[in-house]
């Protein structure tokens, strides 16, 4: 597991705060350390008076966020770990939704599971033509657990949202926009 300081890059350009999830070898999958770092980094930029807009992106060109880090989740057996795993993502997603600054997702590749749920929390999305979005948890027998089903239905045509949730299929950037 990477150290929190290694997994999240914070930069500022003029009045733009940029959060880069920095785990390209794992397709920027969200383990507990990354979730903790994301909570802290987002709060830092959200409370910075010099930052007027926040951009969230993923390192590398293959993935924005490929979802939760299943290897990390499965490496721990205690119920408290599962609760921490879920609580952290709910904290940051809710904070993104209620932020008084515009939050932009710059989706540069795969956005699966928690990655799709993360971009659904943002105000504006810029999605690369090669990006794929989806909620594949259903193929593992899991319902998306970070509010993605509720956000997707509010933001997409109901039939498209149901298709994604029931099949676990992926959609292209062109279909998503």
What are the residue ranges of the model-derived segments?
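Conserved CoA-thioester-binding segment of acyl-CoA-metabolizing enzymes
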Residues: 1-57, 94
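Crotonase-fold acyl-CoA enzyme core
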Residues: 2, 95-177
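Glycine-centered loop/turn positions within well-structured domains
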Residues: 25, 62, 71, 150, ...
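Phosphate-coordinating loops and pocket residues in cytosolic domains that bind phosphorylated ligands
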Residues: 29-32, 66, 75, 154, ...
């Amino acid at each position: 597991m990477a150290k929190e300081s290694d997994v999240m890059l914070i930069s500022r350009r003029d009045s733009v705060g940029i959060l880069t999830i920095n785990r390209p070898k794992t397709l920027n999958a969200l383990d507990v350390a990354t979730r903790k770092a994301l909570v802290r980094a987002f709060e830092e930029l959200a409370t910075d008076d010099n930052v007027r807009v926040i951009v969230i992106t993923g390192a590398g060109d293959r993935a924005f966020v490929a979802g939760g880090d299943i290897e990390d989740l499965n490496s721990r057996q205690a119920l408290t770990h599962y609760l921490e795993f879920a609580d952290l993502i709910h904290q940051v997603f809710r904070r993104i939704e209620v932020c008084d600054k515009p939050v932009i997702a710059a989706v540069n590749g795969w956005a699966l599971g928690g990655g799709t749920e993360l971009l659904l929390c943002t105000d504006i999305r810029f999605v690369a033509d090669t990006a794929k979005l989806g909620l594949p948890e259903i193929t593992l027998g899991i319902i998306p657990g970070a509010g993605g089903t509720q956000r997707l239905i509010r933001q997409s045509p109901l039939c498209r949202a149901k298709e994604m949730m029931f099949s676990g299929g992926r959609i292209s950037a062109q279909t998503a926009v």
